[in-house]
Amino acid sequence: MKSKPVEKKRKVRDEESDSESDDELANGLFDGVLEASEDEEDYIPSDEIDDVDSESEVSEGSEDAEEEEEEEEGDDDALLSDDIPSDDEMGKLSKDAEELEITEPGVDPKPKHQEEEDRNYKVVKDANGGERYVYDEIDPVYDSDDSDAQGPVNTIGNIPLSFYDSYPHIGYDINGKKIMRPATGDALQSLLDTIEVPKGWTGLTDVNTGNPLNLTQEELELVRRVQHGLVPDEGYDPYPDTVEWFTSKQETMPLSAAPEPKRRFLPSKNEAKQVMKLVRAIREGRILPYKPPEEREREEEEKEEVQFDIWQDEEPAAPNPMHIPAPKLPPPGYEMSYNPPEEYLPTEEEREEWEKTDPEDREKEFLPQKFNSLRKVPAWGTLVKERFERCMDLYLAPRVRKNRLNIDPNSLLPKLPSPAELKPFPTVVQTIFRGHEGTVRSIAIDPTGVALATGGSDGTVRVWELLTGRQVWSVKLSSEDPVYTVRWRPTKDAFVLAASAGEDVFLMVPPHSSVTPTLDQASRDVLAAGFGYATNGQQPATAPGKEPAGKWARPGTKLEDAGVLVRVTVRSAVKVITWHRRGDHFATVSPEGQRSSVAIHTLSKHLTQIPFRKLHGLAQTVVFHPLKPLFFVATMRTVRCYDLQKVELVKIVQPGAKWISSLDIHSGGDHLIVGSYDRRLLWHDLDLSNRPHKTMRFHPKAIRAVRFHKGGLPLFADASDDGTLQIFYGKVPNDQLESPTIVPVKQLKGHKVVNQVGVVDIDWHPREPWCVSAGADGTARLWM
């Protein structure tokens, strides 16, 4: 019962021992054979090999091989007959294997330490405690079968790595150890690897190892040489020096070995004498080069002909610095073509008129003609005459050389400061005043800077709060005529507003939150003072049959209740109202009134006067001098300055404009600006000249209003029909020798153009750098 399992177990152990012994003995015999072969190649001398017969060597070798095989078989039998050998038995077997090494007679055995160095393996213990031979990796040399490429580390053979996808390793090395799969990074590491490319990087992966396949330094050098068109092998010389294995020179032994004499290395004196003799003969002409007879005869004939250079002794003259080249003829035009366009050909009437005109009075000396081809064009009959006249012009007409100056146009322009350095000035719209129906024709800010008055085409006058845009008061002056102008009385002792509608000028005291009862009563007293003066019989009498220059009256109960206290009626429609700086006089302009177009009104006396019997042109606008008793009247083309005390003409200013639209004077009284309908803004220095000091064109359409800042700020502005306002920085220096500084700083856009009309009027705040504008779009705007 128990014998069967024991036998089975014994049989299994025998098989395991057989396999282990076979592996160990096979390795041992293989190593011994290699050592024997190396010993034979290294230590057998050649003289002994010659003495030994080849046949005996073969027989001896075969006998030795048979003996070794018998011994190995005996050892195998011994191993098969027992169980796994012990350590003593393994030592005995290894000793027997050492005794079985093949040695040749007459050959000295190697020393033991040299044999250990020459061995290509190591002896280690296996799992059972036995010896195990671990061979070194083969390093191929130049004489090996594969010396170019190193043997693969992975020894799995030609097997796809996909078979190892489910294993942590990818194969085995030559020693049977597992080659673990290389670690792979995440996407960020892959991106960094592609950015920081190492030296020799190819972007490929080794199929056998899974590692990146990089090029070695030798491979990189090989690639570089191929790219540069060089020979791949650095040591290869494609153009070696020629080795003459055979020569045509016959080298014979000299008869004498004496050294060469010095005369062999020095030039011959006899030859030098012969050469100098030939040189002297060539210089003297006794030796001539060979020439054909024909050429020699031709030279002799040329020598017989004597030629003289008449300009031989003439010295070159310097070029005349006064020479002026003749002007060039103008290039021909289309009318001189033999086939001109139809519009250049004259009609029958033009031809007859040209023929009847005298040749001296003709604009052209010829009439354009048309020919179908150039060959049909006849000769020009007056060619000789034209050439003669051209020569006469060049001969008789004097020429003048004009020196042109190469001047940069930008250097002639004045250096203007930057607009950012000239602040403050208005830049943006702050408040929009809406309420009028139609065009807002006039606008004005009161002397305190709180209230704003506007007059429009709807015949109404409206008063607004300047900062909030709230309408405070409104009155309708006329249902037929528009309100052309509104102007505040310039003094602060009364709150009086003047407005014109048709032939009437209305004086009113509008209610406002800033007006105190005392100020309101003072304003009413100023307007009512003139009625007492007229009642006392002080009103000047007019000639019989003529209307008075102005009628002062009360407007009626309805308007008086609204705040309109006085109405002044003149002979024609009033378009302009201008106050004197003291507030007791104001002037009106009626362009259609002819002689009575300009009138001066006295508020304290309710008196109207016509200062001019005759005006040279239609009056457009007037303005009082801010400091002197001077009165400026602008007609269509000129501005006349009158002295009201002396009643005389002081100056005539000629702006050069075709039609003057507006006028204003600087607070200093020495400078004047004029706006015109021909799109020009003109600055006049009254002390300098009657002509404009500077002309500015910044608008594509007409300029309707110009205004200086009265509060001391160096600002002025103009309003145009293109819907824009142009703000200028205008500084007047105290020194009269200096010119004023005029810089355009800002263009304000906001108003819409209605029926070719844009911005109609403009006014400045008395203290702040703010301005207000009235436009044809029915709005008024406050710019800050």
Swiss-Prot record:
Family matches, as PROSITE patterns: WD_REPEATS_1, WD_REPEATS_2, WD_REPEATS_REGION
Principal place of residence: nucleus
Keywords, alphabetical: Nucleus, Repeat, Ribosome biogenesis, rRNA processing, WD repeat
Ranges of Acidic residues composition bias in the record: 15-25, 36-88
Region listing for Disordered, in residue ranges: 1-125
Alphabetical list of SUPFAM superfamilies matching this protein: WD40 repeat-like
Superkingdom field: Eukaryota
GO terms for biological process, alphabetical: maturation of 5.8S rRNA from tricistronic rRNA transcript (SSU-rRNA, 5.8S rRNA, LSU-rRNA); maturation of LSU-rRNA from tricistronic rRNA transcript (SSU-rRNA, 5.8S rRNA, LSU-rRNA)
Family: Belongs to the WD repeat BOP1/ERB1 family.
Name the UniProt record assigns to this protein: Ribosome biogenesis protein ERB1
UniProt organism field: Podospora anserina (strain S / ATCC MYA-4624 / DSM 980 / FGSC 10383)
Lineage: Eukaryota, Fungi, Dikarya, Ascomycota, Pezizomycotina
Gene coding for it: ERB1
